[in-house]
Amino acid sequence: MTDSDVAADPQEPDSLSWREQAVARSLDSARLRAETRVQRFLDAAIELFNSGSGKDFTVQEVVDRSGQSLRSFYQYFGGKHELLLALFEESVRTTTEYLRVKVTDEDDPLERLHTFVVEYYRVCRPTPEQGATVPGRAPFMAEFAQQLLTEHPKEAARVFSPLVTLFEEVLDGAAAVGAVRAGPGHGPIVGVVLEAIMFNSFSSTIAGLSVDPGGQGTAEDLWDLIFHGIGTGATS
């Protein structure tokens, strides 16, 4: 085996998601059992988050709610940080799937971009009251994203890659019809726009305004701001 063969090994840790790394700690023969156990820990953590404790729950609380052992938890996760990463990764994945369905429903490339911006904004909105949910909502997405981007940029890049890929596809489609500016600058634009959508979803909270459950009006305002920043004016 050559050095290049080793480098190309698909099981390199950096190529695996946090959830996959947790499951990979188990023997292949027990993979299905490991998948089930990991999912039970993730489900327990989501329940705790939704119960109002946010991400301030303890590992022991997750263990107790999952009905499993502390020893089992540390078989799959190095600690609470890895559990939060796995949760956030699942949030990004489900959000990306939701957004892909929404943009696929649109035929016009510019309307696909419009739909992506508005729907992603709605997904990132803080829930104004218990029971008011948006399909595809990502638990603690904006809050944990800020911490992740600041303290662990390499991990953040991995976690956000599915969402970034989808947005690049949508942006390229709009550029192809001349609706937005084309060129090599799309890389920075992707990051700036995604960040603007995610963190502007809390603008009402910052300004001390009441939170609109749907957030549609504010989402459209943000779309106007973004489009006038990157649009060409060729398509209305």
What are the functions of these language-model segments?
Residues 122-169, 176-180, 188:
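Short secondary-structure transition hinges
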Residues 34, 38, 84, 88, ...:
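Amphipathic, non-transmembrane alpha-helical scaffold segments
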